[in-house]
Amino acid sequence: RDCLLSRGLGDVYKRQVDMSTGSLGQGLSAAVGMAIASKMDSAGCRVYCLLGDGEIDEGQIWEATMTASKYKLDNLCIILDNNGLQIDGKIEEVAGLTNIEGKFSNFGLKVINVDGHNIPNLIDAFDTAKQTKGVPTIIIAKTIKGKGVSFMEGKAEWHGKAPKQEEYEKAIEELRRGVE
């Protein structure tokens, strides 16, 4: 059961993941710091930061966004999982956040909208982000929370909740059927 599904939340025990954060929005601030350090060291590294749309109602996200724009961090790519749900329910009911694309664009980011379940479109979005110069990029990936798992799809109550063994097995089976 060594997968994200079995834990309910992310972890840092993967070589490609330098840190995992969450709903308080510290992840983007850390990513901005890493992107600045990479530029200062001429390391040529790209920094990727995955955000949930529930955490962008935190002020720290917008402070980090302003900083990324100010320093023209074109080595920073933010991916926003825009599924419309957070732990407390629907985004528009909890935070009232609207026009996400416009907000990030107004802060000076290159905005790329994509179907987050379409792998070829995601690859194209990452290629575009890599070629973008002078500004940070955000890929807004429109997704469905729990897509492909009948009892999880579109349900906020599965946020941060690990499934029981029988639920886990059913979820894995449904996901396998979906990719065959």
Question: Where are the model-predicted features located?
Answer:
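Single conserved hydrophobic/aromatic residue that forms the stacking wall/gate
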Residues: 2-13
